[in-house]
Curated annotation (Swiss-Prot):
InterPro entries (UniProt xref): NqrB/RnfD, RnfD_bac
Recorded name of the encoding gene: rnfD
Primary residence: membrane
Subunit organization: The complex is composed of six subunits: RnfA, RnfB, RnfC, RnfD, RnfE and RnfG.
Membrane topology: Multi-pass membrane protein
Functional summary from the UniProt entry: Part of a membrane-bound complex that couples electron transfer with translocation of ions across the membrane.
TM stretches of this protein: 23-43, 44-64, 72-89, 120-140, 214-234, 241-261, 266-286, 300-320, 321-341
Compartments where found: Cell inner membrane
Protein name: Ion-translocating oxidoreductase complex subunit D
Gene Ontology biological-process entries: electron transport chain; transmembrane transport
Enzyme type, top EC level: translocase
The organism of origin for this protein: Vibrio parahaemolyticus serotype O3:K6 (strain RIMD 2210633)
Cofactors, names only: FMN
Xref: PANTHER family: ELECTRON TRANSPORT COMPLEX PROTEIN RNFD, ION-TRANSLOCATING OXIDOREDUCTASE COMPLEX SUBUNIT D
Similarity field: Belongs to the NqrB/RnfD family.
Length: 348
C-alpha cells in the first residue's frame, strides 16, 4: 500500500484565516444587536462606516507596499478590527473619530509592524486608547439607554448627528444629548466611580435610574449577548477557553476580595462582569491570536493579568473602564510570559 506524504505543516484544522474572522464577526452579532437595541442606530451606522474605511485603508496600504490588495482583503482581518473599534466607541461619535482610529489601527498598529500576524499589540485597542487620550470628551460621552429616553432619536437623525453634528431639526449633538439625558452621561462604571468618590454608598449609587437589576440598564444585556457569542466561539473551537477563563476568574476574584475588605467602595463581582466591555474584552479582544500568549499556561496567566489590571484601573485609575489599557499592558508582557511558560521539550 502506498501512502501520500504531504509536506509540513501538518495542520489539524481546515479553517483558514478568512473563515476564523467570519466566525468572529458572526458571533459578535448578538452583542451588536443588543447595543443597537439599547443605544440606538448609532452603533450600526458606525460599524458600516468603519468597515468601509478599514477596507479602503487596507487596500491603500497594500498598494503602497506593492502587494495585492485583494489577497489582503480576503482575510477579513480589517473587517474584524473595524468591528471591534466601532462597537467600543459611543454611538453618536462624529465620523472623524472612526477615521482617525482606523488610521492608527490599520496603518500604524498593524502594517507598520509588517501586517497581519506581525503586530505586537491589538490594533483595535491601540486605536481606542489613542482616541480616548486624544479626544476624551467625544470618547466618554455616551447617551442614556433608549429605555430611559421618552423620544428615541431615529435613524435619519442619528445619521445626521454623526456626519454633520446636527439633527434634521437643527439641534446640535450637545443639545440633543442634553435633551435626552438631562445631563451628559457616561457609562454605569463611570457613574459608579463618581458616586463613590463623592461619598455615596454603593446601594445609593445603584439606586440611580441608569442602573438595572444586576448592572447598568442595557449594559448587562449587551455583556450577556457577547458572552453567548463567546461561548459559541469556544464551542466551535474558534478560540480556546484559557484566556477568557483567566480574565473572568481574575476579575471575579479581585472584585470579591475587595468587596469584602472595602464593601463601601467596591462594586460586586456580578456588576463588574456585566458592565463595560468585560465580555467583549474577554472573548473577542483578549483572544487575538497574534498579540496574545501562545502557551497553555501563558494564556491563563495572560488572561488573569488582564482581569487584574481591569479591576485595578476601574477601581483606582483615571478612566472608568480599563479593558483597552489592560490588554495593551498584557500584550507588552507576552514575550516574558511565553519565555517562562514554555513547555518542556520531550527528553530534556
Amino acid at each position: 500500500m502506498s501512502f501520500f506524504i504531504a509536506s509540513s505543516p501538518h495542520a489539524h484544522s481546515r479553517r483558514s484565516t478568512p473563515d476564523l474572522m467570519k466566525w468572529v464577526a458572526l458571533c459578535a452579532i448578538p452583542g451588536l444587536a443588543a447595543q443597537t437595541y439599547y443605544f440606538g442606530w448609532g452603533t450600526l451606522i458606525q460599524l458600516i462606516f468603519a468597515i468601509a474605511v478599514a477596507v479602503s485603508l487596507e487596500a491603500l496600504v497594500m498598494i503602497c507596499r506593492k502587494r495585492s490588495p485583494m489577497r489582503a482583503l480576503r482575510d477579513n482581518s480589517a473587517i474584524v478590527t473595524a468591528w471591534l473599534l466601532a462597537v467600543a466607541i459611543p454611538p453618536w461619535s462624529p465620523w472623524w473619530i472612526i477615521v482617525i482610529g482606523l488610521i492608527f489601527a490599520i496603518v500604524i498598529a498593524k502594517h507598520l509592524y509588517g501586517g497581519i500576524g506581525q503586530n505586537l499589540f491589538n490594533p483595535a485597542m491601540v486605536a481606542y486608547v489613542v482616541l480616548l487620550i486624544s479626544f476624551p470628551v467625544q470618547m466618554t460621552s455616551w447617551s442614556a439607554p433608549t429605555l430611559l429616553i421618552p423620544d428615541h432619536v431615529n435613524f435619519a437623525d442619528t445619521l445626521s448627528l454623526i456626519f454633520t453634528g446636527f439633527d434634521y431639526d437643527g439641534l446640535s449633538l450637545q443639545q440633543v444629548r442634553a435633551g435626552v439625558d438631562g445631563v451628559t452621561m457616561a457609562t454605569p462604571l463611570d457613574a459608579f466611580k463618581t458616586g463613590i468618590h463623592t461619598g455615596a454608598t454603593p446601594s445609593e449609587v445603584l439606586s440611580q435610574p441608569i442602573f438595572g437589576g444586576l448592572a447598568g440598564i442595557g449594559w448587562q444585556w449587551v455583556n450577556i449577548a457577547y458572552l453567548i457569542g463567546g461561548l459559541v466561539m469556544i464551542k466551535k473551537r474558534i478560540i480556546q477557553w484559557y484566556i477568557p477563563a483567566g480574565f473572568l476568574a481574575s476579575l471575579t476574584l479581585f472584585s470579591l476580595i475587595f468587596s469584602v475588605i472595602t464593601p463601601g467602595e467596591t462594586a460586586s463581582p456580578i456588576f463588574h462582569l456585566l458592565s463595560g466591555a468585560t465580555m467583549l474584552g474577554a472573548f473577542f479582544i483578549a483572544t487575538d491570536p497574534v498579540s496574545a500568549s501562545t502557551t497553555v499556561k501563558g494564556r491563563l496567566i495572560f488572561g488573569a493579568l488582564i482581569g487584574a489590571l481591569v479591576f485595578i484601573i476601574r477601581s483606582w485609575g483615571g478612566f472608568p473602564d480599563g479593558v483597552a489599557f489592560a490588554v495593551l499592558l498584557a500584550n507588552m508582557c507576552v514575550p516574558l510570559i511565553d519565555y517562562y511558560t514554555k513547555p518542556r521539550t520531550y527528553g530534556h
